[in-house]
């Protein structure tokens, strides 16, 4: 799997303007990601998701995040996440390693 420290830098650069990871963190433009692993799409309490996100019905894990983060709009057509994605697989692996740790603390 990826490098947690590199993943943290990627999160700060590409994700933190819209997402928080800490327990009890507030929703921003995107939902708080605490507890992400093992949760189904569109399930963060108190966040207003698109029907596309709620109806996707997958459970977030390393494999689903690897695919989603490459091209979010392709993976969930109709998502309001405007992020274009991370094309480099090793960068996605680093980000996922960080998320796995940070969203579970």
From Swiss-Prot:
Subcellular location(s) of the protein: Mitochondrion intermembrane space
Residues that hold heme c according to the record: 15, 18-19, 81
GO CC aspect terms: cytosol; mitochondrial intermembrane space
Question: Where does the record place the modification N6-succinyllysine?
Answer: 56, 73
Give the matching InterPro entries: Cyt_c-like_dom, Cyt_c-like_dom_sf, Cyt_c_1A/1B
Q: Which residues carry this modification: N-acetylglycine?
A: 2
The record's account of how the chain is modified after translation: Binds 1 heme c group covalently per subunit. Phosphorylation at Tyr-49 and Tyr-98 both reduce by half the turnover in the reaction with cytochrome c oxidase, down-regulating mitochondrial respiration.
A molecular function GO annotation: heme binding
What are the N6-acetyllysine sites (modified residues) in this protein?
73, 100
Q: Name one GO biological process term.
A: apoptotic process
Listed A to Z, the keywords are: Acetylation, Apoptosis, Electron transport, Heme, Iron, Metal-binding, Mitochondrion, Phosphoprotein, Respiratory chain, Transport
Q: Which SUPFAM superfamilies match?
A: Cytochrome c
Q: What is its main location?
A: mitochondrion
Pfam families xref list: Cytochrom_C
Q: Which residues carry this modification: Phosphotyrosine?
A: 49, 98
Give the protein's function. Electron carrier protein. The oxidized form of the cytochrome c heme group can accept an electron from the heme group of the cytochrome c1 subunit of cytochrome reductase. Cytochrome c then transfers this electron to the cytochrome oxidase complex, the final protein carrier in the mitochondrial electron-transport chain. Plays a role in apoptosis. Suppression of the anti-apoptotic members or activation of the pro-apoptotic members of the Bcl-2 family leads to altered mitochondrial membrane permeability resulting in release of cytochrome c into the cytosol. Binding of cytochrome c to Apaf-1 triggers the activation of caspase-9, which then accelerates apoptosis by activating other caspases.
The family note in this entry says:
Belongs to the cytochrome c family.
Protein's name in the database: Cytochrome c
Q: What is the lineage of its organism?
A: Eukaryota, Metazoa, Chordata, Craniata, Vertebrata
Which gene is transcribed and translated to give this protein? CYCS
């Amino acid at each position: 799997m990826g490098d947690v420290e590199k993943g943290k830098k990627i999160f700060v650069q590409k994700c933190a303007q819209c997402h928080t990871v800490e327990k009890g963190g507030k929703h921003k433009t995107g939902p708080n990601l605490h507890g992400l692993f093992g949760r189904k799409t569109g399930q963060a309490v108190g966040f207003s998701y698109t029907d596309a996100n709620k109806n996707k019905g997958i459970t977030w894990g390393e494999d689903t995040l690897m695919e989603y983060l490459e091209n979010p709009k392709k993976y969930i057509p109709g998502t309001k996440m405007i992020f274009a994605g991370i094309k480099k697989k090793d960068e996605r692996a680093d980000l996922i390693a960080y998320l796995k740790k940070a969203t579970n603390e």
